[in-house]
Each structure stands twice: as C-alpha cells, then as structure tokens.
Amino acid sequence: MDSGSRVNVNIQGTRVLKNKLGKIPDIDISTDGKYLLSASTNDVLLVWDLHTSNKVAFFEAPSVWIMTCAFSPSTKSIAAGGLNNFCVVYDTSVPDADPVELVGHAGFVSCCKYVDDGHLLTGSGDKTCMFWDIEQAKAISVLKGHEMDIVSLDFLPSNPNLFVTGGCDKLAKLWDLRAAYCCATFPGNTSDINSISFFPSNADFVTGAEDGIARCFDIRASAEIFQYSSPSSSPINSVLFSKSGKLLFIAKDKTCEVWDSISSKTITSLTGHENRISSLALTSDGTMLATGSWDECVRLWSSSG
C-alpha cells in the first residue's frame, strides 16, 4: 500500500461490497488474494470473489452473533465463532455439509486464526486460548494467563508457533504453542485492547485500544517503541500494518487513518463508511486494503504508489 520512502501515498477507494445481511464484525482475505470472507451479525458468512465482486459462497453459522471469521491457508475451509461459545469450521467446497464444531470454551469466541489447514487457534471471553486439531474436533492445549476476556490474537509471521493476544485486562501477552505457555507480558495499555497485529517482517506488534491509543512493542526488548494517539480519543477498533510496515492502518469510528510510523504523521483518512469500521484486512501483496463496517458494507482500497 505504501510507496517506498515517499510520505504522500495515493490510496483510492475502488469498490463497495454490499452485504445487506447485518453488521459486519470481521473480515478476512485469502492467502492468494482472490477471495474475501465477511461475517455478519445475522449469522451469515459470505465468500466474495475480489476480481468480480460477486458472492461465490454462502454459509449459515449456528451462532448468536458472529464475532470472528478466518480463511484457512489453502482456502479449503473457513472458521467462525461468536456468542454461542464455540467455533465452526466449514469445507468451502461443500457448502451444504455439516460444519465441524469445536466445543470447549466457557465464554464467547472473539477471535480465531488458522495455524495451518489442520489446526486453529481461538481466543475467548473465558480468558483462554485453545489450540485445536480440526479433524479430531479436539483441543490440543488450553493456554491460560489473561485475567479478563481475550479479544484479539495474531501470529508472528516468521514463526507460527509464537503468537500475541490482547484483551480487556489491558495486557498484551506473547505465547509459545509448543510449550503452551506465556513467554512474556507487555503492560502499558490503559484501557481494553481491541486489536493486536504483528509487523510483517520482524518481531514488533501493535495494539489498538479503547482509549484511542495504539502502542507498538518489540518482543525482543520487551519494550514499547512508539505510540499513536487519536486526537479525538475515539476507541480504536482495528489495527494493521502495511506490507512494508511503514504504514499503520487504524480503524476508529467511521474512518481508517493511514499513519506513517516513521514520521509519526497521519498521511490521510479513508472515509465513506456510514457506521463504525470493525475490521481491516490486507492482501498478501499489500496492494489492496479492505475495511469491514457495521454499515453492512466492505470497502476496497488500492494504491498506485
């Protein structure tokens, strides 16, 4: 999305995908950049073709308000979780087949990400993460350490055994799946963490919080390295780095700020949504950003820079 060392980045809205099936709490883009997955609060999952903007698959999830969704690395399956405390996994090639149900959490499932095609990680309002064998529909391990709801998680791009979580206890934590334990805790946030995301090429991660502050931490130094503060103190709903890591996308209210992490300046604000932006997703080549919103739309943005 960014253009080398230039500060002026030309990001343009290209298309709008209209859901009309309820608020969109989460979106994901397939690894190959061909498809977008959107979840709606009316318990519907839609798969969109990003080339044609057409809906290509429709799944009804047995939930009471979906909160999270994810593509598998191969796009052969999708996962979703919500207020019914479990996660469902669908085979995308057989839309009418019964989903695999991953049951075990004692609270809502707020976030999920695939480790690989056969394994999934979920975070929950029961303060735990669970690492699942999808084929067996069984939890391999339960990771405990947060004092309140877990809201967001992300994997270290260079090592999927390591991941970070953020939650309502204002803490970010680093975990190792191999030993199923917490490696480090990162204090510093002064309100609930709504979103957490790794820098694409190293061991830094960013948190977006309810108080409108985004903080970037280095897991090697166990220290905060920079901070963004919203002028309006509006809650940050989602954060995501550009492919190079130079830009930080920050979703708050109805806008997405594009912030230069080197100069510590806002380059532009992406507008057009009529309700809060809840989720951000980026194609693996970094050329397309998607914003999902409670206005029942997904907006697509691209840059020629």
From Swiss-Prot:
GO biological process: adenylate cyclase-activating glucose-activated G protein-coupled receptor signaling pathway; G protein-coupled receptor signaling pathway; negative regulation of induction of conjugation with cellular fusion; negative regulation of transcription by RNA polymerase II; sporulation resulting in formation of a cellular spore
Cleaved signal peptide residues: none
Entry's Gene Ontology molecular function annotations: signaling receptor complex adaptor activity
UniProt main location, coarse: membrane
Repeat (WD) residue spans along the chain: 19-49, 61-91, 104-133, 145-176, 188-218, 231-260, 272-302
Compartments (UniProt record): Cell membrane; Cytoplasm; Nucleus
Outcome of gene disruption: Leads to starvation-independent sexual development; the effect is suppressed by cAMP.
Entry GO terms, CC: cytoplasm; cytosol; heterotrimeric G-protein complex; nucleus
Keywords: Cell membrane, Cytoplasm, Membrane, Nucleus, Repeat, Sporulation, Transducer, WD repeat
Function text: Beta subunit of the heterotrimeric guanine nucleotide-binding protein (G protein) involved in glucose-induced cAMP signaling. The beta-gamma subunits (git5-git11) promote binding of the alpha subunit gpa2 to GPCR git3, which senses extracellular glucose, to activate cAMP-PKA signaling and repress sexual development and gluconeogenesis.
UniProt protein name: Guanine nucleotide-binding protein subunit beta
Organism the protein comes from: Schizosaccharomyces pombe (strain 972 / ATCC 24843) (Fission yeast)
